[in-house]
From Swiss-Prot:
The active site is at 23, 150. The keyword Transferase applies. Its EC number is 2.7.1.148. InterPro entries: GHMP_kinase_C_dom, GHMP_kinase_C_sf, GHMP_kinase_N_dom, IspE, Ribosomal_Su5_D2-typ_SF, Ribsml_uS5_D2-typ_fold_subgr. Catalyzes the phosphorylation of the position 2 hydroxy group of 4-diphosphocytidyl-2C-methyl-D-erythritol. This is 4-diphosphocytidyl-2-C-methyl-D-erythritol kinase. The keyword Magnesium does not apply. Pathway: Isoprenoid biosynthesis; isopentenyl diphosphate biosynthesis via DXP pathway; isopentenyl diphosphate from 1-deoxy-D-xylulose 5-phosphate: step 3/6. It comes from Rhodopseudomonas palustris (strain BisB18).
Length: 306
């Protein structure tokens, strides 16, 4: 009781803050479509150093306000995954302390980098802090899974191999990878990309390589070339159908792939955000400046993955 009272007192005078980091699928294999409509996936996932920012202030009612350059793209706050995640956790934790969330929306939406899922995961982490819950609390994990397929991996926000429908996470120690991320400011609905893949209910994709049994992963301290070799052997199975829906994705990949110092260019998730891993941070920054100059209306970020 004393601990709960202490947490309530602290939260009442001090807002809690967290970052919702962008998720990047370095590889993404679609193994098949389950009879329940979900797709079985295997993906090497990393997290970038760009993020939305979320704040929680104690209050008697659950609410959300959103600001930032992407706020007009967010839609109705009542449908936001932040609210959905909080409500799902409230169904599992008696007398859950919630309050007012404030979202600073920096990441593009419907972009293949888990923006909404990362926001929901950040909300769950904030609520865990406010209610003295461990991040591995089964109720928190279950709420994350029920919120969305990408929310569990975003809850951890650590590089990993993600399998199943996103519920199984195998740790993978990645080095810091210099990266440029580009979104051409077109939204791509995940359901449309999967539909374009054309898998029937219960259909398996015979012959798809299992990334878990891929060639041995390099040590974290291994040279960049070793990591590029393994990652380049992978693929994003959603890239081809996404390019059919939004051909500009192909243009982005071409620009990134021919940039000086680019070692690997690929689409993340269901698009339209693409990324390129570079030889060093200077090359990444130069490429980002070049893309921004040629396409000032695109979202461009130079940073690191890890």
């Amino acid at each position: 009781m004393a601990r709960a009272a202490e947490l309530s007192d602290v939260m009442s005078v001090q807002a809690l803050h967290d970052e919702a980091r962008a998720k990047v699928n370095l590889t993404l294999r679609v193994l098949g479509r389950r009879v329940d409509g979900y797709h079985e996936l295997e993906s090497v996932v990393a997290f970038a150093d760009c993020a939305d920012r979320l704040t929680l202030q104690a209050g008697s009612e659950l609410s959300l306000t959103a600001t930032g350059p992407r706020v007009q793209e967010c839609g109705d706050n009542a449908d936001n995954l932040v609210i959905k995640a909080a409500r799902l956790l409230g169904e599992r934790v008696a007398d859950l302390r919630t309050g007012s969330f404030a979202l600073d929306k920096q990441l593009p939406i419907a972009a293949g980098i888990g923006g909404g899922s990362a926001d929901a995961a950040a909300a769950l982490r904030l609520l865990a802090r406010a209610n003295d819950l461990a991040l591995d609390d089964p109720r928190l994990i279950d709420a994350a899974r029920k919120t969305g397929a990408d929310v569990p991996v975003c809850l951890a926000s650590k590089s990993c191999i993600m399998t199943g429908i996103g519920e199984t996470l195998l740790p993978l120690a990645l080095p810091r990878l210099p990266v440029v991320m580009v979104n051409p400011r077109v939204a791509v609905a995940t359901k449309d990309v999967f539909a374009a893949l054309g898998l029937r209910s219960g259909q398996l994709r015979v012959g798809v390589t299992d990334v878990v049994t891929a060639p041995k992963w390099p040590d974290q301290a291994a040279p960049l070339d070793a990591w590029i070799a393994v990652l380049a052997a992978g693929i994003n199975d959603l890239e081809a159908p996404a390019k059919k829906l939004q051909p500009v994705i192909g243009e982005v990949l071409k620009l990134l792939g021919k940039a000086r110092g680019a070692r690997l260019a690929r689409m993340s998730g269901s698009g339209a955000t693409c990324f390129a891993i570079f030889a060093d941070a200077a090359a990444a920054e130069a490429a980002a400046q070049s893309v921004s100059a040629a396409h000032p209306d695109w979202w461009v970020h130079a940073g690191t993955l890890g």
